[in-house]
């Protein structure tokens, strides 16, 4: 399984770049061709990359953890402090500094005030709404460096991993099914600006890791079907 994960790292990273490449400059071009390509290459084909990254994170976090221990939990937090938190802070500080430099050079006030919210949810990503139960769902948010919402959510999930482990350990597939229903039915109200996408796919990967499922090996047997399905789906998208 690990060899498949290593092989996927670069392609998935490239797909994430595709997601964020269809920016304001491209959307400002009045062209149906550009709009169509942007929709397919940025908003359609690569959308599975981020969920898969969450699933891989969950798999790797729990692959060697059949039983929970606070010692192991603290060790994992210590490693994530250097691999997640420090880079997260640094890149958000750099982003804020660049935005501030732009405002100052234009003789304007800072449009982003200096506060903790720069590192949490100063940017609104989605829109507000209501779910099927009529509950109010607030907009999802991101830090000043918008793509790093993934890292923010992942850090929160890692902190909550003892709870997720308990759910999977004692409720097993039922706990996974409950989270899936809440996610796909849109019942989660985006508490703190966080969607449930990270929790759901992290738990899905964690479930595979805890049970040592060789997902990559099983899917490799069906690669011709996957390839044909991809070609057909891509053709249908182009024909829209």
Give the residues covered by each predicted segment.
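Alpha-helical transmembrane segments and terminal signal-anchor/GPI-anchor hydrophobic tails
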Residues: 197-203, 211-240
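Functionally critical transmembrane alpha-helices in membrane proteins and complexes, commonly lining
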Residues: 3-65, 84-92
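Solvent-exposed interhelical
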Residues: 155-180, 207-225
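Membrane-interface helix-loop-helix regions
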Residues: 84-153
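Membrane-embedded alpha-helical segments of multi-pass membrane proteins
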Residues: 11, 45-56, 147-159, 195-204
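Aromatic-anchored segments of alpha-helical transmembrane domains
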Residues: 14-21, 177-190, 227-240
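Membrane-helix interface linkers and caps
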Residues: 61-80
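Alpha-helical transmembrane spans of integral membrane proteins, capturing the lipid-embedded, hydrophobic core
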Residues: 48, 80, 84-96, 154-158, ...
């Amino acid at each position: 399984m690990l060899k498949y994960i290593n092989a996927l790292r670069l392609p998935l990273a490239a797909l994430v770049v595709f997601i964020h490449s269809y920016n304001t400059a491209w959307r400002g071009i009045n062209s149906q061709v550009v709009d169509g390509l942007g929709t397919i290459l940025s908003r359609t084909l690569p959308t599975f990359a981020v969920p898969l990254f969450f699933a891989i994170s969950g798999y790797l976090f729990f692959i060697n953890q059949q039983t929970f221990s606070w010692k192991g939990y603290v060790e994992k937090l210590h490693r994530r402090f250097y691999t997640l938190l420090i880079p997260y802070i640094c890149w958000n500080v750099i982003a804020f500094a660049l935005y501030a430099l732009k405002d100052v050079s234009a003789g304007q006030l800072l449009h982003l005030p200096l506060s903790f919210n720069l590192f949490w949810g100063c940017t609104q990503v989605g829109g507000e709404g209501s779910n099927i139960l009529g509950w109010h769902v607030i907009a999802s948010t991101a830090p000043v460096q918008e793509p790093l919402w993934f890292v923010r959510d992942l850090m929160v999930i890692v902190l909550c991993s003892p709870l997720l482990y308990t759910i999977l350990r004692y409720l097993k597939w039922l706990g996974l099914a409950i989270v899936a229903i809440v996610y796909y039915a849109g019942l989660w109200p985006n508490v703190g600006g966080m969607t449930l996408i990270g929790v759901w796919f992290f738990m899905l990967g964690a479930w595979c890791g805890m049970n040592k499922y060789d997902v990559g090996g099983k899917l490799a047997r069906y690669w011709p079907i996957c390839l044909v399905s991809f070609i057909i789906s891509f053709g249908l998208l182009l024909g829209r």
